[in-house]
UniProtKB/Swiss-Prot annotation:
One Pfam family from the record: MR_MLE_N
Keyword rRNA processing belongs to the record: no
Residues given in the record as Mg(2+) binding sites: D207, E233, E259
GO biological process: amino acid catabolic process
Classification via PANTHER family: D-GALACTONATE DEHYDRATASE-RELATED, STARVATION-SENSING PROTEIN RSPA
Lineage: superkingdom: Bacteria
UniProt keyword terms in alphabetical order: Magnesium, Metal-binding
Stated role: Has no detectable activity with D-mannonate and with a panel of 70 other acid sugars (in vitro), in spite of the conservation of the residues that are expected to be important for catalytic activity and cofactor binding. May have evolved a divergent function.
Recorded GO MF terms: magnesium ion binding
SUPFAM superfamilies xref list: Enolase C-terminal domain-like, Enolase N-terminal domain-like
Protein name per its UniProtKB record: D-galactonate dehydratase family member EGBG_02030
Source organism (scientific name): Enterococcus gallinarum (strain EG2)
Annotated positions binding D-arabinonate: H209, E259, R280, H309, E336
Length: 402
């Protein structure tokens, strides 16, 4: 009689192969040949996620059947009574992805086969062009085009145009300052120059990163309409999502939102009211694969497309999961590809998807198709530096949103 498969151990691995703190999870079973890996990165508070897994989820899960993914996700998510939030959801995500990885390995199928099979041959993606000036932006976009990219997100001067000179009080509080008026003016000038040079041969998008007030966001969106953007991202913060109906009624520019969402109430209304065009969830922030598959179905029913968040603060495992879901979703829109995915990422996370000429490609290995080289991970230790870009301020010294 075959021995029942159970979770034997859960290991949390922290690493920073490209200088950004990452958290990965490895779930092992009583069969030494069967294990799974997942992404649990909440980079700004990564050690809290480690504690949540080691102290709470690990003892809760050891001895359980790793194939009962739905039951494990549901019980683990409510076992602390209080639920959602970036710490618990990222911890859950690492476990959840690892269990799906195990499921795929047991079935000897890549995840995309378990999800119903491919509906496209590769995943179209956009890449960043983060420049310090308008002229630099034009040059960098040309570089991206020469690299084969057709869809490009353009930022000038950081989020909110941080590098711009501005009128400040005599004595100002330390922080990263930005001026919304200068920022909007600079971006309009930048898109004018980009359309002059490239015409409509490429698709462009932009991330406001919640740096504007609702009225400023409406004004900015109207000014951007003539540039035919793929979408305008995070024009408003999660705390102001009720303003999206007002924004939607005053502009025809496609709207994208979602990377900061943790709670179903944050996205459900936007989807059901068709207030956004693209849902930009960060999959580990909502709890992993299990909840995301349900969200995809909800969005599909209302004609909202996916555009998963794919930043540098995500393991190669997370990028692969994004791609498995994108390649199997009929309501897929586009996927983000990080410029931070470089040689060290592939050393630490062998099997990480590759991008070529604007498309992302998966391998055909069972499960997620990505592993963790623990020896390589240890060669890139994490650090405790605070991210200064989150400490942003308006010209008068008041705190802004990052």
């Amino acid at each position: 009689m075959m021995k029942a498969l159970v979770i034997e151990d859960i290991k949390v691995i922290t690493t920073a192969p490209e200088g950004i703190n990452l958290v990965a999870v490895k779930v092992t079973t009583n069969d030494p040949s069967i294990y799974g890996v997942g992404c649990a990165t909440f980079t700004q508070r990564y050690e809290v996620v480690v504690t949540a897994i080691d102290k709470y989820l690990k003892p809760f899960l050891i001895g359980k059947d790793p194939q009962r993914i739905e039951d494990i996700w549901r019980t683990a998510s409510v076992s602390s009574y209080w639920r959602n939030g970036p710490v618990l959801n990222n911890a859950l995500s690492g476990i959840d992805m690892a269990l799906w990885d195990i499921k795929g390995k047991l079935a000897n199928m890549p995840l995309y086969q378990l999800f119903g099979g491919k509906v496209r041959d590769a995943v179209p993606a956009y890449i960043h062009a983060d420049a310090q000036s308008v002229s630099d932006a034009v040059e960098l976009v040309q570089t991206r085009v020469d690299q084969g990219w057709k869809q490009i997100r353009v930022q000038i001067g950081g989020y909110g145009g941080n590098n711009q000179a501005m009128h400040l009080p005599k004595d100002n509080t330390p922080g990263v300052y930005y001026d919304p008026d200068v920022y909007m003016k600079t971006m309009i000038e930048g898109f004018e120059k980009l359309r002059e040079k490239f015409g409509d041969s490429i698709k462009l998008c932009h991330d406001v990163h919640e740096r504007l007030s609702p009225s400023e966001a409406v004004k900015f969106a109207n000014q951007l309409e003539k540039f035919d953007l793929l979408f305008l991202e995070d024009a408003l913060p999660p705390e102001q999502v009720q303003w999206f109906e007002h924004l939607r009624s005053h502009t025809n520019i496609p709207l994208a939102m979602g990377e900061l969402f943790n709670n179903p109430h944050e996205w459900t209304g936007l989807i059901q009211n068709r207030t956004i065009d693209y849902l930009r969830l960060h999959l580990s922030q909502v709890g992993g694969i299990t909840p995301t598959r349900k969200i995809i179905s909800l969005a599909d029913a209302y004609g909202v497309r996916t555009a998963w968040h794919g930043p540098g603060d995500m393991t190669g495992i997370g990028h692969a999961v994004n791609t498995h879901l994108s390649i199997t979703s009929t309501n897929f829109g586009i996927q983000e590809w990080s410029c931070s995915i470089k040689e060290n990422t592939y050393k630490v996370f062998p099997g990480t998807p590759v991008a070529k000429d604007g498309y992302i490609y998966l391998n055909d290995q069972p499960g997620i198709g990505v592993d963790i080289d623990e020896e390589a991970a240890a060669a890139f230790p994490t650090h405790d530096r605070m991210a200064d870009w989150t400490l942003c301020r308006l010209p008068d010294g008041s705190a802004g949103r990052p």
